[in-house]
């Protein structure tokens, strides 16, 4: 009898999780469909980029069935703020990303997408983690981004940014598909863990809020990457001093 009750409760909780799951984005036909409620305003940037000299930090190439994406990451070469950040954090940030999409069987670039962030008060950080957390499972890395395959020709490109030591890091996700580059997620979130299985990748996230008594109220989420879709599940909240 106890076993039956346990299995029943397990099934109920599984159903509740399915009900609470919400779609962040999905690929429908040739279109990336997303929800604006998961995209907070991007950082403000009013700098004249043409007057800034950049140095290339890294480069990745993503092969798709319909072509490939040539992605390059840059940071400014000089400036007082840049020197301060280099001295404080090390050379682990960038402020410009250029994505060149080359369609199959074509010799020239068919589409270029450029993301700038030269506002200085907000850094897009390499996936080093150690600047903001001491969790030992997170290995230091000089990777400018994380890439998750959603299918043979679609990718989720994850960037991690930080405004200052007070705000939680920002997780920004772009989906690349058939030459399209679309921002589908931009929220203040800390990454507590990353889990993978044969069919999905799960990012366990935490957002921090404060109640009227200045107690921390973490909200916990699972961000699930699976075939041609990203979904999110709110797990629970807890209060602590």
Predicted regions and their residues:
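Acidic, small-residue rich beta-repeat scaffolds with periodic aromatic anchors
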Residues: 21-58, 66, 77-89, 174-241
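Short, solvent-exposed loop/turn segments at conserved positions within beta-propeller repeat blades
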Residues: 86-94, 164-169, 216
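Bacterial N-terminal signal peptides
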Residues: 8-15
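Short glycine/acidic-enriched loop and turn motifs that connect beta-strands
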Residues: 77-79, 162-166
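Beta-propeller blade signature
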Residues: 94-100, 170-177
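Positively charged n-region of N-terminal signal peptides that target proteins for export
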Residues: 1-4
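Acidic/hydrophobic-patterned starts of short beta strands in beta-sheet-rich repeat architectures
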Residues: 60-72, 149-161, 201-205, 215-216
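Surface-exposed loop and turn segments in beta-propeller and other repeat-based domains
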Residues: 36-39, 43, 109-137
């Amino acid at each position: 009898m106890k076993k039956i009750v346990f299995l029943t409760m397990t099934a109920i909780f599984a159903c509740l999780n399915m009900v609470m799951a919400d779609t962040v984005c999905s690929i429908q036909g040739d279109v990336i469909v997303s929800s604006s409620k998961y995209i907070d305003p991007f950082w403000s940037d009013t700098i004249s980029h043409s007057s800034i000299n950049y140095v290339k930090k890294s480069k990745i190439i993503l092969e798709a069935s319909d072509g490939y994406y040539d992605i390059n990451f840059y940071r400014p070469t000089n400036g007082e703020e840049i020197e301060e950040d280099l001295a404080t954090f090390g050379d682990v940030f960038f402020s410009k990303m250029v994505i060149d999409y080359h369609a199959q069987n074509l010799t020239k670039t068919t589409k270029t997408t450029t993301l700038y962030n030269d506002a200085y008060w907000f850094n897009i950080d390499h996936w080093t983690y150690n600047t903001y957390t001491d969790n030992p499972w997170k290995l230091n890395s000089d990777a400018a981004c994380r890439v998750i395959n959603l299918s043979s020709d679609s990718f989720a490109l994850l960037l991690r940014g930080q405004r200052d030591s007070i705000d939680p890091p920002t997780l920004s996700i772009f989906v690349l598909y058939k030459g399209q580059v679309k921002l589908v997620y931009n929220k203040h979130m800390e990454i507590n863990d990353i889990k993978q299985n044969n069919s999905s990748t799960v990012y366990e996230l935490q957002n921090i809020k404060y109640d009227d008594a200045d107690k921390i109220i973490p909200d916990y989420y699972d961000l699930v990457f699976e075939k041609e879709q990203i979904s999110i599940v709110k797990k629970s909240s807890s209060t602590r001093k």
